[in-house]
Amino acid sequence: MQSSAKKVALPAMTLAALGVVFGDIGTSPLYAFAQTFTSAHVNISEATVFGILSLIFWCITLSISFKYVSIVMRADNNGEGGIMSLLALLLRIKQLDSNKKIYLIALGFVGASLFFGDGIITPAISVLSAIEGLSIATPAFDRWLIPIGLGILTALFMVQRHGTATMGKFFGPITMLWFISIGALGLYSIIQTPHILWFINPIWAIEFAIHQPFVAFVAMGSVVLTMTGGEALYADMGHFGRMPIRLAWFIVVCPSLMLNYAGQGALLLRDPQAVSNPFYLLVPEWALFPMIGLATAAAVIASQAVITGVFSMVNQAIQLRYLPRLTVIHTSDVEQGQIYVPFINWVLYISVFFLIILFESSSNLASAYGVAVTMTMLCVTILISVLAYGAWGWPWWKVTLFAVPFLALDGIFVASTSLKILSGGWVPFVIGVVVFTILMTWKRGREIVFNRLETDALPISLFIKSIGSSAETHFVPGDAVFLTGNPNIVPHAMLHNIKHNKVLHSRNIMVTVYTEDIPYVAKEQRVQLEKMDEHFYRISMYYGFKDQPNIPQALEQAYQALDLEFDMMQISFFISRDRLIHTVGDGMSPWREKLFISMQRNTSPVSDFYQIPPNRVVEMGSQIEI
């Protein structure tokens, strides 16, 4: 029965993966092939068409089919993938000292920052390239393309707060129809010009690079557009598993993409003028409007997948303490991964809106797109090479055989796309720098605050002894919960409570929340308890980086384990609200300190983040100089 269930589940999961994982790379044929010719000013001939098709085929084969599907997807963190999971795996390597880990964290932050930039560009370029088919139908639509695109994307971002669980059921079938359609269009064109299939021979790519080296180099900056979204295979592994994603790639996605690219190449051999929009010029006139509708649906699905990916990455970064607390809303009672981050949603929407106004067309946006993709691929190659050597036990020669060719290939991609910096490539670069600065500043700022608190801290063991020997200590009925980052020192809120209220509660519970480097922690492993004396308890709560912390829920579990009666109305949560003050010192540069203080002031309340009832919270203020 279990085997039968797995057989039924595998096709269903594979279909679902199509709608989430492959939307981005699946819409690349709308613009990537044409952009390769126009950006590099390639003269259309049999040699150049075959050469570029061969480059596309072998780059996809090496970078996606081999590197991502065969190698990178092995790096699963309890089934989860993505740059944050990869970073968590790397930080477990015992041979790495703290200095090397800092460099790896920085590199992981670079990859995460660029993915955020990708989340801004993908919706804009996908939707614009889809609706540009309307201009093929009639030039009258030209002036309406931007308003239509903005309208579609506005609706997409507005619906995020309600969740996409209902619509998500249709993503897989729609994307399957999309891949079947683009594959069929390509096949029909190939039948008319069958010798186009010789592009599979790598000699065409080699000869193109030898005879026109600079043109081939520039073209590589657009060839990479055929691989945009390839990182989603790894990032979404936790949702669907390795096998469904691999099956979808090799059986449906890769064949459909290559058929369509070959079909576009065959069309150019028959009609070089079709380079203006070879994708839509493949479509028969009677099918043009249905295809535009299907392409728009596929583009919206691709955009949704990237938006969801950004939400997930931001949530993981918050749980791992790499970002300040933000409001995270769960939009589904069934699926834990269905979340909505309001602040990030509006940042994405405003950024996408201005991108469309600024660049106006998908061909202009393509210049901005490649930079983020290539640098992310380079970061992943470096990180996975370190993991293979340090954690998988690969010998140095095996790591070298993997790393050198892919570092060279990714290096060529980065160098080629860097030519686009002035014409639009600065956009993801600026976005990446801003996000990277925020990540590093928050991480460093938290370290400084933590060190300041520990410098003036009082060990909890000494405090309990002094309380026990003092006749002046007054205890009042009820339970007090104090959140603390270090369970071995007295929480600031407790000291302030004694200072101002002159009392302690009959039960004082110090709670420390830990985020593990695994996605989920089982309920039975959630809490660890220690009774220090009759008035003091220490509770450690453990969550994975994809769990949503719920302190009252975990506290009830702890009370049951201690055989205590749990009554939320008898519990007060004392939280220290730190007021940071900028000082001249060895911390951070003044502008970074001001940035950190601003982020600290605008974090969402601790009670919201840990799902503590606001009417049970007592905030105790304190000042910390940084």
Curated annotation (Swiss-Prot):
Domain of life: Bacteria
Record's keyword annotation contains Membrane: yes
InterPro entries in the cross-refs: K+_transporter (IPR003855), K_trans_C (IPR053952), K_trans_N (IPR053951), Kup (IPR023051)
Subcellular location as annotated: Cell inner membrane
Membrane topology annotation: Multi-pass membrane protein
GO molecular function (one): potassium ion transmembrane transporter activity
Ranges annotated as spanning the membrane: 8-28, 44-64, 102-122, 139-159, 171-191, 196-216, 217-237, 249-269, 281-301, 339-359, 377-397, 399-419, 421-441
Catalytic activity: K(+)(in) + H(+)(in) = K(+)(out) + H(+)(out)
GO cellular component, one term: plasma membrane
Keywords associated with the record: Cell inner membrane, Cell membrane, Ion transport, Membrane, Potassium, Potassium transport, Symport, Transmembrane, Transmembrane helix, Transport
UniProt cross-references to PANTHER family, sorted A to Z: LOW AFFINITY POTASSIUM TRANSPORT SYSTEM PROTEIN KUP, OSMOTIC STRESS POTASSIUM TRANSPORTER
Entry's family note: Belongs to the HAK/KUP transporter (TC 2.A.72) family.
Annotated function: Transport of potassium into the cell. Likely operates as a K(+):H(+) symporter.
Protein name: Probable potassium transport system protein Kup
